[in-house]
């Protein structure tokens, strides 16, 4: 009878997969502890292997991302150099080394709608241009580059140097103070001031994130900051386009101008207060709800007295204003490193 019971127990353990311990009526505690320790070590080894595999995959993805980013930048550089060569072939009237008097000025479009001084082409010889390139610590001749392409590259570098000087001047002196009180009377002037301030702030935000090392972006917080910046930049570009096209009414534009002015003066409490008045207005419902009952109320008409009330109903404007709020948050967080604008 005992033999039959032991055989049944052994078969049951085989079916359950728990036949590590011998089928006995009794066993020592030390054997049980050894078996438990063995299972624990096996599970720990499996978890370590999974962790190492996950870490290896993340490292491979990061390397692929960096390689892709480097490849895209190289392709962009090649494309820009190819465009410059094509532009040189179409705009250069003759293969002369000296620039002709008819083309003494290089047409430079406004960069980011800021005033950029024109770059004049002096009658420099190729030897003088090579000397200038050496002073700028740039290669005097690229592979397969013609003399005309060298001259064009020099003036392109000169243009970028001028833009860099303007950027440095903006970083040290700051942009013009926004005259938000006359936003309705002198709207074109104030629009230019607001656009210049927003673009300058976006550049500072971008430089702040670019100055961080690659290792710092491994944390979830840094990745979230980068994601917020990309989305905010995209929506702020839409807001800038709305301002340039004068697609905003005077009340909304004046409120945005005042928000930017308060950021210039580092008055972030007033800037946030103005943001709340712009987004919510006189309405007590921040999500656009204006009716909570079936009966019309006298106070409901007063809720719509301010044209900016319930502005969050418009999805496009809501995203723009959300990006503006994130812009205010960044300015407030980095206010110690940003210059205060003076009249």
UniProtKB/Swiss-Prot annotation:
Gene3D superfamilies: Functional domain of the splicing factor Prp18. It comes from the Eukaryota. Keywords: mRNA processing, mRNA splicing, Nucleus, Spliceosome. The keyword Magnesium does not apply. Pfam families: Prp18 (PF02840), PRP4 (PF08799). Residues 80-105 are annotated as: Disordered. This is Pre-mRNA-splicing factor 18. It comes from Schizosaccharomyces pombe (strain 972 / ATCC 24843) (Fission yeast).
């Amino acid at each position: 009878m005992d033999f039959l019971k032991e055989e049944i127990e052994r078969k049951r353990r085989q079916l359950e997969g728990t036949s590590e311990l011998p089928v006995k009526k009794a066993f020592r505690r030390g054997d049980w502890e050894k078996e438990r320790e063995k299972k624990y070590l096996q599970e720990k080894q499996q978890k370590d292997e999974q962790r190492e595999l996950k870490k290896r995959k993340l490292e491979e993805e990061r390397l692929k991302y960096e390689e892709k980013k480097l490849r895209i930048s190289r392709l962009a550089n090649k494309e820009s150099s190819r465009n410059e060569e094509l532009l040189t072939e179409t705009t250069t009237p003759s293969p002369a080394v000296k620039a002709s008097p008819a083309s003494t000025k290089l047409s430079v479009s406004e960069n980011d709608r800021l005033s950029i001084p024109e770059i004049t082409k002096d009658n420099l010889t190729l030897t003088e241009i090579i000397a200038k390139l050496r002073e700028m610590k740039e290669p005097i001749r690229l592979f397969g580059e013609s003399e005309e392409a060298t001259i064009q590259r020099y003036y392109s570098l000169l243009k970028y140097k001028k833009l860099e000087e303007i950027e440095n001047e903006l970083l040290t002196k700051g942009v013009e103070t926004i005259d938000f009180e006359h936003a309705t009377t002198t709207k074109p002037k104030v629009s230019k001031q607001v656009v210049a301030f927003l673009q300058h702030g976006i550049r500072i935000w971008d430089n702040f994130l670019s100055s961080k090392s690659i290792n710092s972006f491994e944390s979830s917080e840094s990745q979230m900051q980068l994601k917020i910046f990309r989305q905010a930049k995209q929506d702020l570009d839409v807001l800038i386009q709305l301002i340039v096209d004068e697609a905003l009414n005077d009340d909304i534009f004046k409120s945005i101008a005042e928000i930017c002015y308060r950021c210039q003066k580092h008055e972030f409490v007033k800037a946030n207060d103005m943001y709340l008045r712009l987004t919510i207005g006189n309405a007590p419902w921040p999500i656009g709800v204006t009716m909570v009952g079936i009966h019309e109320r006298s106070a409901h008409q007063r809720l719509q007295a301010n044209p900016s009330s319930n502005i969050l109903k418009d999805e496009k404007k809501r995203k723009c204003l959300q990006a503006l709020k994130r812009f205010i948050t960044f300015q407030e967080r980095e206010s110690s490193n940003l210059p205060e604008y003076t009249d």
